[in-house]
Swiss-Prot record:
Pfam family, one: Baculo_LEF-11
Region: Disordered, residue numbers: 1-24, 119-187
Native source organism of the sequence: Lymantria dispar multicapsid nuclear polyhedrosis virus (LdMNPV)
InterPro entries from the UniProt entry: Baculo_LEF-11 (IPR009429)
Gene that this polypeptide is encoded by: LEF-11
Annotated family: Belongs to the baculoviridae LEF-11 family.
Keywords assigned: Transcription, Transcription regulation
High-level lineage: Viruses, Viruses incertae sedis, Naldaviricetes, Lefavirales, Baculoviridae
Function: Involved in late/very late gene activation.
Protein name, per record: Late expression factor 11
Entry keyword annotation includes Transcription: yes
Amino acid sequence: MAPAVVGASQLRGGDSPGPARNRDHCLNRSEVYALTREAINKRKHLGDVKGVCAHLFDDSFSAQSDYIRENLATAFIVVGDNCRERKHLGQHAARFDRVFSLKRRTLYDEYHASAGRYGDTKPCRKRRFSRAAQVRDQPAQQERLGDQSVQDSPLRKEKDLVPHQGVGGVRPGQENGQARQEEQSQQ
């Protein structure tokens, strides 16, 4: 007799998939900035306008981050389209501090902090030069043949150009009344 196969949902103790069960543990940067915008709008609505126009990199932005930290325990984000599930943000205080502290770093420092956190200590790979890069560095064919003037080209000679006929016998630069007078004089 073969042993019974146990499904993954039975091992977890429920039928909910992993990402749905752990949605409170994931908070991305766009959600942090969405909460920041909502906090600014709430402060404007309450009449507290100190530093609401401050950019993230300004020193006066600390009023926004302080307001968010004060109200983080009761803040939540609605998850999904049915608006029944909520992502509570009280447990994400460290994430908010990390995102707001990025403004004091350069991109180089942020890269090394992220790489160190996730265990990647290798430097970026060096740029390799390819044949395509060498071809791009060569002068264009037009520059090499620069002694032939564009005006002397057979495509630019007036005898080769077809004159443009306007709509209804009107040539460019001619008014509609002038064309009628010329037609009557020709008849």
